[in-house]
Amino acid sequence: MAHRSHTGTGPSQRQLRVGELIRRTLADVLNRGEIHDPELNRLSITVGEVRCSPDLKVATVHVMPLGGKNVEEAIALLSKHRGELRHHITRQMTLKYAPDLRFRPDETFDRLDETRRLFSDETVMRDIRGGGEADED
């Protein structure tokens, strides 16, 4: 079997696959309330994306509580239970190392709102339809 290394600028297929498995595992654990903390279980947290480092030792988890409120509280609670969450991940996956979990706010929805706002702008709509005037040099 040939050994190939990933030389591209983006994440490798393995990073993407492991990140998605971690995302699904964390989402299931949080959805089922398997972490025994009433403060954490009262929050409905969405795990939007997990990005893994090339060596798969660090996983950055992008999360957002339902409604977008209490983001810092959710991240603090998840960080507090990092070890227990890692334990759930290692039970579901066979990796050489259990990845260190780092929690960050998921800004995908903010970017989506900004994109929608841009597309609703009249100048942008005119450019999309081809009605804009071409710049002449």
UniProtKB/Swiss-Prot annotation:
Annotated Gene Ontology cellular component terms: cytosol
Subunit description: Monomer. Binds 30S ribosomal subunits, but not 50S ribosomal subunits or 70S ribosomes.
According to UniProt, the name of this protein is Ribosome-binding factor A
Is ATP-binding found in the keyword set?
Answer: no
| Localization in the cell | Cytoplasm
- Function in brief: One of several proteins that assist in the late maturation steps of the functional core of the 30S ribosomal subunit. Associates with free 30S ribosomal subunits (but not with 30S subunits that are part of 70S ribosomes or polysomes). Required for efficient processing of 16S rRNA. May interact with the 5'-terminal helix region of 16S rRNA.
The answer to keyword Transferase applying to this record is no
One biological process term in Gene Ontology:
maturation of SSU-rRNA
**Listed SUPFAM superfamilies:** Ribosome-binding factor A, RbfA
Q: Which GO terms describe its molecular function?
A: ribosomal small subunit binding
Keywords annotated in UniProt:
Cytoplasm, Ribosome biogenesis
Annotated InterPro entries: KH_dom-like_a/b, RbfA, RbfA_dom_sf, Ribosome-bd_factorA_CS
